[in-house]
């Protein structure tokens, strides 16, 4: 089982496992370890929906033993195991899932049988095991549009402050394995402040057309339902400036923190 996979980590979903073969008979035993699908079709799934492709590799003998057609393929280069009476040998296998095929969070599995097959398709025994991939609920956010970076922080220039909507093209991009929530926190509770003075200008913000409450921790619920969501439809971020009359000249600013939580 590949545990706790984060599809946005940039890492390949993979795990290794050992299988030990024991000859408890009184004669030498020659066989080829093969994987059979207990129930086609091929792929890790929840029982319905899109399946995730994978590969099985025998790392001990450097052989691909993936049961694409329902059973591991035997080729002229396939190694046989030869065990003397009461001898055992452990093989190391690696399961690698296709990260591009992950449709959503959840646990995706496939039941297989590992079989010791001798000549003439003779079976010396086998056992069932479950191949699986556990995909964690996960989400990532990023900005696009008119902003710059300064000491690791995104800086948005609102220009000369005027009451009303600021024409600044800015979008929030969200990648998620399903539903998500956004939290927005304003250091000045929805006010642009002149340095460390008490001079402030109120403002509001909306994300994706939804107003955010900046007086506390503003919460926004993302789309409901399951399934992988990409950033193909970025969420516009808009700023509306309040009353600027009778304010001292200078640079007014606030620090906004936006975080995302996958559900």
Give the residues covered by each predicted segment:
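N-terminal small/polar-rich segments of proteins
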Residues: 1-46, 80-83, 87-199, 225-263
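Surface-exposed binding patches on compact interaction domains or structured appendages
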Residues: 27-85, 192-217
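Phosphate-binding glycine-rich loops and adjacent basic patches that engage nucleotide phosphates
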Residues: 72-77, 132-133, 165-167, 216-221
């Amino acid at each position: 089982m590949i545990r706790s996979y984060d599809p946005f980590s940039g890492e390949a979903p993979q795990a290794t496992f050992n299988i030990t073969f024991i000859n408890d008979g009184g004669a030498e035993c020659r066989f080829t370890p093969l994987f059979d699908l207990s129930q086609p079709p091929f792929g890790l799934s929840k029982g319905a929906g899109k399946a995730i492709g994978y590969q099985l590799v025998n790392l001990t003998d450097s052989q691909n033993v993936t049961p694409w057609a329902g059973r591991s393929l035997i080729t002229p280069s396939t190694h046989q195991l030869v065990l003397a009476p009461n001898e055992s040998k452990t093989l190391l296998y690696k399961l690698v899932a296709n990260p591009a095929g992950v449709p959503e969070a959840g646990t995706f599995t496939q039941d297989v049988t590992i079989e010791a097959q001798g000549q003439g398709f003779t079976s010396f025994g086998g056992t069932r095991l479950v191949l699986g991939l556990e995909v964690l609920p996960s989400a990532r956010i990023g900005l696009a549009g008119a902003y710059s970076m300064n000491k690791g922080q995104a800086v948005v220039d609102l220009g000369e402050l005027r009451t009303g909507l600021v024409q600044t093209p800015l979008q929030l991009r969200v990648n998620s394995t399903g539903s998500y929530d956004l939290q927005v926190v304003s250091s000045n509770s929805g006010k642009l402040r002149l340095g460390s003075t008490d001079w402030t200008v109120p403002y509001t913000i909306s994300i994706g057309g939804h107003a955010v409450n900046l007086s506390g921790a503003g919460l926004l619920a993302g789309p409901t339902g399951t399934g992988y969501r990409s950033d193909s439809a970025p969420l516009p971020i808009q700023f509306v400036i309040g009353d600027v009359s009778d304010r001292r000249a200078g640079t007014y600013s606030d620090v906004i923190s936006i975080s995302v939580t996958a559900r």
